Amino acid sequence: MERYKGLERLLSELEEFLFILDKENLSSAAVLKKSIVSEILQLFIKSNSSCDEEYIYMNKVLETDKKEAQGKQGKAQVLDPPAKETLTNGTAGQHLAPPQKSLPDLPPPKIITEKLPVSKCDSPEGYYEEAEPYNASFNDDGEAVSSSYESYDEDESNKSKSAMQQHQWPSTEASIELMKDAMICAFLWRKKWLGQWAKQLCVVKDTRLMCYKTSKDHNPQLDVNLIGCSVSYKEKQVRRKEHKLKITPTNTDVIVLGMQSKEQAEQWLKVIQDISGLQSDPLCDSSVITADGQRQIHPKAEGTDRHSGASESGSSTDGHPETPEIKEVKKKVTSGLKLSNLMNLGRKKSTSMESPDKALETSNYLNVLINSQWKSRYCCIKDGQLHFYQDRNKTKNAAQPVSLIGCDIIPQPTQDHLYSFRILQNGEELATLEAKSSEDMGHWLGLLLLESGSRSDPEDFTYDYVDADRVSCIVSAAKNSYFLMQRKYCEPNTYIDAPRGQRYQQDDLYDDVDMSDIQGDEPKSEEKGEAEDKMYLDLIPTRSFLHSVGIKSLCQALGSPGPERVSGKKDNEESERGTLSCREQDSSGQVTEETKQVTEDPPQQTSPGTPIIGPSVSASPRLEKSNKERVKATNHVAIETLLGKNRTEAEIKRFTEEKEKLEKEREEIRVQLAQLRKERREMKETVTNCPDKGLLTDLEDKLRLKEEQCKERESYRVDLELKLVEVKENLRKAELGPATLGTSVEPAHLDTTAPSIKSCSPTHAPECSPVTATVGSPVNSAVALKSRPQPIVTTGKVLQKAKEWEKKGAS
């Protein structure tokens, strides 16, 4: 008898002691030890309840002492499974006992209000009864789930005030480790993706919103960065008012939180708006928020963000280190998340289908180390510099921009900051940055490596404290962003056809023509009555003189034709190259011109074997004298020089020689690479089988040197391949001839429509009279254009681009 009384008194004193400890601000070790003592106490009572229960209740009925009745009441509460929350989540404090699978945790506010008014005359069975709060049900994991959410309106003052006091921060929950440095926290209703409402502990700490299933959990179910998000307050008029906050983060789905009152909603709205930096309108409308917005489309991305949340929240300006339990991340994949992926396959397009320019982002939020403190800043790459801004609006610079040219980008992961990297210039640290995930870190590494001009390979970096999967993700994202950025700068363009950082070398769109010809024809070229008749040089598609017969002799014989008045429509249609067409600028667009037959004095005697091309152009009498002088002055100048044909031939020759040289050098490098790899393989085998530790160090140094040589030659081979592709492209352009205006013509058509070349013997060269052409009717330029063959539409270089892309990817 005395034994049981002593045990009962011990239990009562121990319970009171635990209540006192709940009111104190304990360290983590003390909280852990207190939870262990409480767990042992519960297990002891549970194991002995079967034999002592009847006797204890008999004592409760017969004993009239007030103190012992209160002690027995405390023991009955310990024995009552639902009353466990009184010890752990009571009004006096919070107890961090591990959750029992067989004893689901009830929401704390529902138990507090009902367990306090207990009289000593109640029947023993009353201690085992507990009404379910509201109409909530409990699932397997002990989480309160309700199919509908109804807040208490302001007219129900008592319940509203009590609920706000129990849920609104600050509360007794603030003594928990999770609540330290929190801006605001409360038990709120969160809408799940199937429309269900679950009451969870929501905490806003630093710049993140974290939702916990219970106050004992260290791993949040939801961890979202609030920077840049939009938030709106919605009030729905139903049977009772519903106060909801709709939060739309930048990289995850919509989050809907249910509040107890309008004041609580406005308080949360203000806190989230201050963090996000976007003052969204507190719109109150009656629209129903669908459950589609809450479907978890990216469980994997959420896992990575949740993992990186430890580093980001740990890198706050407060400098408080996070506990290992918070940094630890558990991968949980539920059937609901898998089902959401299947339901949303057709809703969201893959990012690979988007254009590279759209998918390639050069600005985003990063953590920046400023004065030994991590701060979130909006970083943007522009004109070879990395700019830092306070927010996305770019209204205020947070720091001086960093020039990236010539810098070294080196990852430096630490135990607290896995995705941090540094920007160095000549060994001096310019900036230290931290990404939010492995994919984001790889993306920024690729961008910074390309902008800095560094030839470092992301695979060669050392990633401490990062596992193999995340390293693979970082390397893959870095290469992807690097090649996308390189493609953005190096993709061929009509107007900008040069890689980034190189001087733009454009093909001359117009051939070089001496100004002396034009200046000689300008004076006295027209009369007052003939002012309306103007002459234009009809630039029609021509092939390079490489494809013609008698090129050299033709180049030596012909001079430079100037803009002259043309007569001869039929001859113009027969020989479209080498003739001039007249166009009269009137409203009808037709060309009307009088037929004029003018004989021109024969040109100077040409060199032996020089052919004369026909038909020649007959000029008006007024231009005859000036034409004679011009022909004499420019007879020694080849037409190819004036029209840029010699330049084309020289370019073809130069590019051909350069291509052959590069191909030969490529083969030599391949042979060298094969030899180096063979030597490296043999050296690795030697190092593996070497028993002598003294020789092992020398062999390892030689092996490291051999690997560096392999990497250097491989990098040189990649540059050589890219240069060879560029030379081949330039050679192809040169073989097509100079750029022309208008339409393009098939080569076969040029062969058939080439003008006949009339050769004169050396002795009879002076007697060769020029051919004069006559015109039967005016020339309609529109009809002449229609009679020409249809242009060849050159579209698509898919195979060529694919091969180039494969070469870049293989390197």
UniProtKB/Swiss-Prot annotation:
Classification via Gene3D superfamilies: Pleckstrin-homology domain (PH domain)/Phosphotyrosine-binding domain (PTB)
Residues covered by region (Disordered): 67-110, 132-168, 294-326, 500-532, 558-631
GO biological process, one term: positive regulation of epidermal growth factor receptor signaling pathway
Domain of life: Eukaryota
A molecular function (GO) term: SH3 domain binding
Subcellular location: Cytoplasm
GO cellular component: cytosol
Occurrences of domain PH (ranges): 181-277, 359-453
Annotated keywords: Coiled coil, Cytoplasm, Repeat
Listed Basic and acidic residues bias regions: 299-309, 521-532, 566-577, 622-631
Function of the protein: May play a role in a signaling cascade by enhancing the kinase activity of src. Contributes to src-regulated transcription activation.
Identification of the protein by name: Actin filament-associated protein 1-like 2
Species name: Xenopus laevis (African clawed frog)
